[in-house]
């Protein structure tokens, strides 16, 4: 059965348009809106229930290697508007989301230049939806961290030992799959999925994290956001944020132990899966808080307080283990922060440029503790071959979360071999 037939068969309820409405069922993922032949080119097929917003498989697709991936439709955001529902509480960080297809400026594969993200009335296209200088109608992100699918392929599989970028003969390491047992194996094995794939970019992770923030702000109960907190003190995705497969803020969370040992958890093994997804629903991206330090491409920190982020002209698939920190792929700016473990606080609200627009959700506006962002860690550690890790940071517990951004995180460098290094792949449609 081809993708056209599957798309007609799966699900019976009408799906929300695109990214959906924050706080509501299905928000944060969606049905691929392009030509079904794009899915075929990517090796993807819709799962049963893919078009049904009530299904655990809503917006979920399966790759030929067994990977489960979530479709994240392109969206625009608006920050700090006085008419935003949460403005009285969240002020400058009150976040609104609209599907990008609602704006006449947006078109899949349309050429993009710096400044084109300004869609008017404060609405801004997220940087994650530009790849290789063109607008993209979505990205697909692995639902789970990558593990070995049994054929030495990195695949997103439920209840599995996520792959450690570790120089060890254990079955759950990239070394046993033919890699070097180093952080940069994450790049190699992610892009091996096909021409449209790469290691998840810092922009894609930012988009996913911002969706979680907007969903928490838009929710009024746990009906469609299982991790919702009406007191707004722990209103963010939970996960394996303690070093024993439990969550720092929610004692009801428990994971199965990774084969490495009880310090780590198997991906997709939570007893409360909705609570550990980015959108508080079973259809969402899992294990985005804690678990391990999850590698992303597209960021460098080569000198003090200077961060480089992926250029507009660069495609995510362009990154390899050999060019991973090349200056030709990154544009630098001064964050004003410098080395040390701090906190992530605030979303940058620019309409153009790397420092103020592209960095939104990647680099904070300040480094003070902020419960809106989970009191998550932000740390810089300048050296020539450093990369950005997400989710866990250097100390687990309160500072681990979906807004954790760490240039250190253990040994930190791409060439480092470390048991807390994991990853997931993402892809763009042709």
Specify the residue positions occupied by each region the protein language model found.
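Short, solvent-exposed loop/turn elements at domain surfaces
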Residues: 78-86, 148-153
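Acidic glycine-/aspartate-rich tracts in secreted/extracellular proteins
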Residues: 75-78, 145-148, 298-300, 428-430
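Short aromatic-cysteine micro-motif
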Residues: 55-58, 63-66, 91-288
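Enriched but not universal
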Residues: 1-29, 424-430
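C-terminal, surface-exposed recognition/capping segments
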Residues: 203-206, 234-260, 272-275, 279, ...
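Charged, compositionally biased non-catalytic regions
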Residues: 18-67
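Cytochrome P450 core scaffold surrounding the K-helix E-X-X-R motif
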Residues: 80-83, 297-310
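Short secondary-structure boundary/capping segments
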Residues: 212-219, 300, 309-312
């Amino acid at each position: 059965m081809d993708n056209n037939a599957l798309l007609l068969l799966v699900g019976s309820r009408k799906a929300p348009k695109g990214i959906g409405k924050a706080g509501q069922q299905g928000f944060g993922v969606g049905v691929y809106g392009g030509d079904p032949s794009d899915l075929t080119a990517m090796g993807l097929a819709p799962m049963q229930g893919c078009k049904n917003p009530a299904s655990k498989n809503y917006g979920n697709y399966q790759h030929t290697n067994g990977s489960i991936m979530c479709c994240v439709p392109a969206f625009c955001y608006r920050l700090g508007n006085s008419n935003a529902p949460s403005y009285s509480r969240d002020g400058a960080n009150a976040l609104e989301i609209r599907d990008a297809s609602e704006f006449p400026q947006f078109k899949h594969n349309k050429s993009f230049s710096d400044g084109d993200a300004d869609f008017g009335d404060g609405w801004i296209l997220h940087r994650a939806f530009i790849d290789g200088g063109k607008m993209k109608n979505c990205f697909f992100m692995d639902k789970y961290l990558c593990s070995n699918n049994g054929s030495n392929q990195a695949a997103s599989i439920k209840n599995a030992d996520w792959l450690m970028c570790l120089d060890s003969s254990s079955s759950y390491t990239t070394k046993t799959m033919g890699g070097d047992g180093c952080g940069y194996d994450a790049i190699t094995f992610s892009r091996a999925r096909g021409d449209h794939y790469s290691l998840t970019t810092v922009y894609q992770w930012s988009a996913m994290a911002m969706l979680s923030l907007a969903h928490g702000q838009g929710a009024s109960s746990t009906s469609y956001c299982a991790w919702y907190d009406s007191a707004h003190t722990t209103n963010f995705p939970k996960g394996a944020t303690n070093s024993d497969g439990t969550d720092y803020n929610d004692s009801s969370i428990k994971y199965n132990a990774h084969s490495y040992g009880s310090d780590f958890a198997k991906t997709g093994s939570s007893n409360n899966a909705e609570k550990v997804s980015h959108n508080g629903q079973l259809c969402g991206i899992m294990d985005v808080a804690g678990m391990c330090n999850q590698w992303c491409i597209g960021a460098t920190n080569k000198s003090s307080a200077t961060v480089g982020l992926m250029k507009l002209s660069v495609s995510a698939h362009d990154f390899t283990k050999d060019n991973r920190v090349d200056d030709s792929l990154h544009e630098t700016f001064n964050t004003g922060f410098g080395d040390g473990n701090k906190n992530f606080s605030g979303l940058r609200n620019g309409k153009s440029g790397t420092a103020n627009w592209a960095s939104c959700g990647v680099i904070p506006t300040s480094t003070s503790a902020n419960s809106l962002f989970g009191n998550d860690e932000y740390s810089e550690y300048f050296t020539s071959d450093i990369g950005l890790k997400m989710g866990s940071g250097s100390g687990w517990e309160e500072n681990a979360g979906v807004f954790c951004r760490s240039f250190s995180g253990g040994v930190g460098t791409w060439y480092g071999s470390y048991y807390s290094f994991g990853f997931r792949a993402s892809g763009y449609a042709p």
